[in-house]
C-alpha cells in the first residue's frame, strides 16, 4: 500500500500499479493530495499512445517519417509498395514490442520482427497473433516508412539517435546500432531486440532543435526523443518517450565502459527537480512526523 503523505509537493512517476485496479493517477492523488507529477499524467498518456503522439507532432509541424494511420488493408499494401520497406507498430507499447518490418516478397506481404518472418494476413478484429506460419493482424494499422538509403549492397538503415531532453536542454546523445544486419527485422533498432548503444559527442543544431521541438510539442519536461537521419534526409522524429506509470526510459547505457557521470540521466533529472523546488519555493522534504492513529476510509 501507499502511505498517505500531505507534505509531498512533487512526484516523479515510474511504472507501478494499484492492486485494486484503480487508475494510478486517482490513487496517487488520494495518497499525495498536494503533489504534482513532474511529468503530467496527460503527457504520460499521450506519449504511451503512439498514434496520438504522431498526430500531435504533425499538428505542431515536427518532421516525422511518412506515416499511415488507417483501417484499410489496401492502404497498407499500397504504402509498402511505394516505400519498399515500412514498419508496422502497435499503437501502444515500448522496447520495440509489436514492431514488424514489412516488405513484399514476390506478391506476398511479409512481416519480420527480428526473430521470425511471416506472411501478413489482415483480419477484422482481435489481437495480433501467429496462426500456423502466418501473422494475423487487425486494425488500426499504424505504419511508418523505414528511413534509409538504397546502396549497391542493398538497403542501409538511417542513423537512429536518441536525445535525452531535460528542461529544454539536451545534456547528451546516444545512438542505437548493430554490428551486422542479417534480416529485415534487424532494422528494428531497439536494445531489447539486440541493438547496441553508443554515445554521440555532437550533432547538428538542426537535429538538436528538432528534438527540443518534439519534446515541447507533447509538453514533456523530461523525455527521450528518437530521431532518424541519413546523408540525404532528416532529422525525422520517430517517437517521444517519457518516464511514466506505463513505461520507463531505458538506462542500460549505464553499463557502457564509456559511461561517466555526465551521462547519468537520473542525475540530470534530479537537478531539474531541485531547480523546480528552488523556483517554486517548495520546502525541502522531510520524513512525515508520526500521526495519531485515525480511522480513515479504505480506498479500493
Describe the predicted segments one by one.
Residues 1-78:
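Conserved N-proximal alpha/beta basic substrate-recognition cap immediately N-terminal to
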Residues 16-19, 91-93, 243:
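Short glycine-rich anion-binding loops that position phosphate/pyrophosphate groups of nucleotides
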Residues 23, 157-160, 222:
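Short, surface-exposed coil-to-beta transition loops
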Residues 54-108:
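Hydrophobic alpha-helical segments and helix pairs
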Residues 86, 141-142, 171-172, 223, ...:
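Protein kinase-like catalytic core scaffold
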Residues 104-206:
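Phosphate-binding site of ATP-dependent enzymes
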Residues 198-202, 216, 220, 229-300:
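C-terminal active-site "lid" helix and adjoining low-complexity regulatory extension at the edge
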Residues 211-214:
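A conserved acidic, glycine/proline-rich C-terminal tail/linker
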Amino acid at each position: 500500500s501507499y502511505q498517505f503523505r500531505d507534505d509531498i509537493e512533487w512526484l516523479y512517476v515510474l511504472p507501478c500499479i494499484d492492486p485494486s485496479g484503480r487508475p494510478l493517477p486517482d490513487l496517487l492523488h488520494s495518497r499525495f493530495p498536494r503533489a504534482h507529477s513532474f511529468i503530467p499524467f496527460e503527457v504520460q498518456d499521450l506519449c504511451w499512445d503512439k498514434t496520438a503522439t504522431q498526430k500531435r507532432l504533425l499538428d505542431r509541424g515536427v518532421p516525422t517519417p511518412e506515416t499511415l494511420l488507417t483501417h484499410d488493408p489496401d492502404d497498407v499494401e499500397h504504402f509498402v509498395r511505394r516505400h519498399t520497406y515500412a514498419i508496422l507498430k502497435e499503437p501502444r507499447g515500448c522496447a520495440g514490442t509489436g514492431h514488424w518490418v514489412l516488405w513484399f516478397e514476390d506478391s506476398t506481404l511479409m512481416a519480420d520482427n527480428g526473430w521470425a518472418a511471416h506472411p501478413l494476413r489482415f483480419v477484422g478484429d482481435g489481437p495480433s497473433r501467429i496462426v500456423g506460419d502466418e501473422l494475423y493482424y487487425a486494425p488500426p494499422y499504424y505504419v511508418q516508412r523505414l528511413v534509409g538509403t538504397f546502396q549497391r549492397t542493398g538497403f542501409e538503415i538511417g542513423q537512429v539517435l536518441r536525445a535525452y531532453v531535460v528542461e529544454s536542454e539536451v545534456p547528451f546523445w546516444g545512438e542505437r546500432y548493430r554490428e551486422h544486419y542479417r534480416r529485415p527485422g534487424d532494422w528494428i533498432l531497439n536494445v531489447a531486440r539486440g541493438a547496441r548503444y553508443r554515445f554521440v559527442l555532437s550533432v547538428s543544431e538542426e537535429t538538436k532543435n528538432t528534438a527540443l521541438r518534439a519534446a515541447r510539442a507533447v509538453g514533456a519536461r523530461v523525455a527521450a526523443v528518437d530521431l532518424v537521419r541519413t546523408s540525404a534526409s532528416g532529422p525525422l522524429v520517430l517517437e517521444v518517450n517519457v518516464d511514466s506509470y506505463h513505461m520507463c526510459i531505458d538506462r542500460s547505457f549505464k553499463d557502457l565502459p564509456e559511461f561517466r557521470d555526465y551521462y547519468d540521466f537520473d542525475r540530470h533529472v534530479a537537478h531539474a527537480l531541485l531547480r523546480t523546488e528552488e523556483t517554486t519555493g517548495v520546502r525541502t522534504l522531510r520524513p512525515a512526523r508520526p500521526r495519531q492513529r485515525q480511522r480513515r476510509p479504505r480506498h479500493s
